[in-house]
């Protein structure tokens, strides 16, 4: 019973710490940087939508699409080697718009 009570009292503190660590869209502020360059390895599911689309990785193409975190929409244009670049509007929507 005493250990359950201690855990119950610690839970709000743990949740507060997690909220501080992951409560922002700014990747650098979160401190959990992930790969945004396709040439450096495979892209994670998060990087497909959360990498800054303005990172100039590779050539720019108006044939590509990227996900804009601010508008929560897929938009035309992207950099070929940026993980947040999709070959079609449909691919971007399927990966990112929920």
Curated annotation (Swiss-Prot):
Disulfide bonds join 36-51, 43-83, 49-96, 74-92. Keywords: Calcium-activated potassium channel impairing toxin, Disulfide bond, Ion channel impairing toxin, Potassium channel impairing toxin, Secreted, Signal, Toxin. It comes from the Eukaryota. Gene3D superfamilies: Pancreatic trypsin inhibitor Kunitz domain. InterPro entries: Kunitz_BPTI_sf. Expressed in salivary glands. It is found in: Secreted. GO terms for molecular function: potassium channel regulator activity; serine-type endopeptidase inhibitor activity; toxin activity. GO terms for cellular component: extracellular region. The keyword Secreted applies. The keyword Secreted applies. Residues 1-23 form the signal peptide. Activates large conductance calcium-activated potassium channels (maxiK, KCNMA1/KCNMB), when tested at micromolar concentrations, suggesting a potential mechanism for regulating host blood supply during feeding. Shows no antiprotease activity, and does not prevent ADP-, PAF- or collagen-induced platelet aggregation. Has no effect on blood coagulation and does not inhibit the alternative or classical complement cascades. Monomer. This is R.appendiculatus Kunitz/BPTI-like protein. It comes from Rhipicephalus appendiculatus. The lineage of its organism: Eukaryota, Metazoa, Ecdysozoa, Arthropoda, Chelicerata.
